[in-house]
Swiss-Prot record:
Entry protein name: 3-methyl-2-oxobutanoate hydroxymethyltransferase
Family: Belongs to the PanB family.
Reaction catalyzed: 3-methyl-2-oxobutanoate + (6R)-5,10-methylene-5,6,7,8-tetrahydrofolate + H2O = 2-dehydropantoate + (6S)-5,6,7,8-tetrahydrofolate
Subunit structure of this chain's protein: Homodecamer; pentamer of dimers.
Organism: Shewanella sp. (strain W3-18-1)
GO molecular function: 3-methyl-2-oxobutanoate hydroxymethyltransferase activity; magnesium ion binding
Length: 264
């Protein structure tokens, strides 16, 4: 079984082959997702909400992400493993270097950071020192209080152009992947077509190169607010592994996300 790398995902993009990603936080679920063929696993700071019960992701620490990264690493053989850098863990390039090193040593293949132009120097410096970076634009949950809540981003022409420009700049700075969250589908299409690197969408339509969801949403075990862009695959299959396979199959076929999971 060949390991998934950033080069694998780039090849998938070039071939027009859609790929899947899920969040994971422990060895057991990660192992199940990995063995069923999920290409990318993210130890997300979403754990602050789905595991710890917080209202947002801000309380999560680098040490907590590192702990769960070690857990996930022990459970997988194939998938590319990305670790989120938590709120204020990369406020400066120097701080980012220290915390990203901890996550890479915990077993991550790549780290993910949220933000646009202000991050360019950090992305370049991490990349130059052997730490691959996944960027994240659109609805960036660590900025939820700046946005005034979990809201769709890039609906007006000015902000859409800003997000597109930031995507291009992050690629030029060295980012190897890009996540776009809760943006209109036409904007996600424009970004995906403009970039050479693979683009992963969540609430961004079906045109992106890959899709990512939070595992708790896929399995229908999230409490409280359920995002419009999510889908409960366990409800339609009744078994965890079957739910994961259904997710993979629908992404590959381009039937997920459908219009009901997409913003205009």
């Amino acid at each position: 079984m060949s390991k998934i790398t950033s080069s694998t995902l780039l090849k998938y993009k070039q071939e027009g082959r859609k790929f899947t990603a899920l969040t994971a936080y422990d060895a057991s679920f990660a192992g199940a997702f990995d063995s069923e063929g999920v290409d990318v696993l993210l130890v997300g700071d979403s754990l602050g909400m789905v595991l710890q019960g917080h209202d947002d992701t801000l309380p999560v620490t680098t040490a907590e992400i590192a702990y769960h990264t070690r857990c996930v690493r022990r459970g997988i053989e194939r998938a590319l493993l990305i670790a989120d850098m938590p709120f204020m863990s990369y406020a400066t390039p120097e701080q980012a270097m220290i915390n990203a090193t901890e996550l890479m040593q915990a077993g991550a293949n790549m780290v993910k950071v949220e933000g646009g132009h202000w991050l360019l120097e950090t992305v370049t410096k991490l990349t130059e020192r052997g730490i691959p970076v996944c960027a994240h634009l659109g609805l960036t949950p660590q900025s939820v209080h700046v946005f005034g809540g979990f809201k769709v981003q890039g609906r007006d022409a000015e902000n859409a152009q800003r997000i597109l420009d930031e995507a291009k700049a992050l690629e030029a700075a060295g980012a190897q992947l890009l996540v776009v969250e809760c943006i209109p589908a036409p904007l996600a299409t424009a970004i995906t077509q403009a970039l050479t690197i693979p683009v992963i969408g969540i609430g961004a339509g079906a045109s992106t190169d890959g899709q990512i969801l939070v595992m708790h949403d896929v399995l229908g075990i999230s409490s409280g607010y359920i995002p419009r862009f999510s889908k409960n695959y366990l409800k339609q299959t009744g078994e965890i592994r079957s739910a994961v396979r259904a997710y993979i199959e629908e992404v590959a076929a381009g039937t997920f996300p459908s219009a009901e999971h997409t913003f205009s």
